[in-house]
Amino acid sequence: MSLKEKTQSLFAEIFGYPATHTIQAPGRVNLIGEHTDYNDGFVLPCAIDYQTVISCATRDDRKVRVIAADYDNQVDEFSLDAPIVTHDSQQWSNYVRGVVKHLQKRNNAFGGADLVISGNVPQGAGLSSSASLEVAVGTVFQQLYHLPLDGAQIALNGQEAENQFVGCNCGIMDQLISALGKKDHALLIDCRTLGTKAVSMPEGVAVVIINSNFKRTLVGSEYNTRREQCETGARFFQQPALRDVSLAAFNAVASELDPIVAKRVRHVLTENARTVEAASALEKGDLKRMGELMAESHASMRDDFEITVPQIDTLVEIVKATIGDKGGVRMTGGGFGGCVVALLPEALVPAVQQAVATQYEAKTGIKETFYVCKPSQGAGQC
């Protein structure tokens, strides 16, 4: 049963009438451009064919009722006429409440709604299940009440909800690619202007995501530390963000910077340059160059930004040894575990899956999870 069928049938069963709309918003994988988004830089993600799906309908009153199908049909209910506050015991509820609260703060006029939510974006893997949920909820109210919001505004609203209501500092990339993704394309995003450029993916290329299943523990605290180090670097150069610092300017005075901050800055500057070049390599179908750029990105995350772990490095080595110069592989996401992403010819997928299955667990004691994805369409009706 598809997510659409599941949420529609559950909606009718629980609420006693049929849903009028079913909305989907995808998860994402970032092909290259890591920890550049909050430095006003460039990222190159694609939406993937794992998504959050919501069947919904308007209500005549000012109540919002939500059923989380993936959490034993837990219920949340709140009024649009009372201050929307965080839910103490149901973390998933806060993503919904936060999005609705921030839609209100943007002076959108809308009434109540019934929602049934289900999704298949792997959670805790760095594939943006939370952004997918935020964008799906924003799109629900936009569609039900014809709100004058475009995809970028729905994305910004989701980011605000996550930063200010849920209390997690995130850049704009995850929400933006979920809202604006394009089938068979990656999206080069300028995180300062929110300008996007669709980059066609070469035919016959698979997007493979492998979850290391290494339990991420440091990600929250270390993420904030990295962010502070980048801001320190920008202040040193008297610039609003590292986006405004050239590599030449950095190299001229790198020795004057705190050595750790210097490494963090170098990663961001070189990663921005790699990301812009990667978009052009991908468009030309130059998988060899794309692979080189992904390898440089991984080395930079490992050595300069210091956000990889041995398990992730092992996965990258296994995949790289199998695909050679026919594609690329790197860690993707915030770091300290999570996933690697690989671009490779579809014909090589079985060999990569076999190599990882025989070597990764033997070397690390952990069993991986392997996903083959298609670059997919952003949020909308399904």
From Swiss-Prot:
Localization in the cell: Cytoplasm
Positions contributing to Mg(2+) binding: S130, E162
Superkingdom in the source lineage: Bacteria
Enzyme class (EC, first level): transferase
GO MF annotations, alphabetized: ATP binding; galactokinase activity; magnesium ion binding
Residue positions binding ATP: G124, A125, G126, L127, S128, S129, S130
Pathway: Carbohydrate metabolism; galactose metabolism
This protein's GO CC annotations: cytosol
Site feature: Transition state stabilizer: R28
Catalytic activity: alpha-D-galactose + ATP = alpha-D-galactose 1-phosphate + ADP + H(+)
Residues forming coiled coils: none
Keywords noted in UniProt: ATP-binding, Carbohydrate metabolism, Cytoplasm, Galactose metabolism, Kinase, Magnesium, Metal-binding, Nucleotide-binding, Transferase
Binding site for substrate: E34, H35, T36, D37, Y223
EC numbers: 2.7.1.6
Keyword Kinase included in the entry's annotation: yes
Family label: Belongs to the GHMP kinase family. GalK subfamily.
HAMAP family: Galactokinase
Protein purpose: Catalyzes the transfer of the gamma-phosphate of ATP to D-galactose to form alpha-D-galactose-1-phosphate (Gal-1-P).
The protein's name in its UniProt record: Galactokinase
Annotated source species: Citrobacter koseri (strain ATCC BAA-895 / CDC 4225-83 / SGSC4696)
Gene: galK
